[in-house]
Amino acid sequence: MSTLRVDTVMTTELVTVGPDDTLGEVREVFDTHRFHHLLVVEHFKVVGVISDRDLLKHLSPFVGKLSERAQDAFTLQRKVHQVMSRNVVTIRADTDIAQATRLMLDHGVSCLPVLDERQHPIGVVTWRDLLKAVAHCGLDPLCRLPNSAA
């Protein structure tokens, strides 16, 4: 029986950051793109994930405000490796979405980097992607999503 696979729902437009990039740079990426997660990549390998929530948690709430002080602005200079999630759970593109969902729930994560056979990132699947698939297809294994890769 055919099942809906990760490659039919994953985002393939990857924007990555490096572990030595600053939180200021990450903030610019989040402001420019409509992502909630960024893969942290070093030498073509995923070494971490940083979410918009991680960013907000580690930036001063006074950045960009009239009451901003030097120590508030300094939070923009912190490095990605200081705040990223390091225990990354990854998945392959040919994995079915039920297994992807179980992995997210079992590990308490909201995204899974999708890796190729060389362990290089080729996409990312988020809980939103999985929820959209279920909302559109229900449990129909033959369903194809609009704009799907497969």
Put a short name on every predicted segment.
Residues 30-33, 38-54, 104, 112-128:
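A glycine-centered beta-loop-beta connector
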Residues 17-34, 40-42, 81, 90-108, ...:
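The conserved cystathionine-beta-synthase
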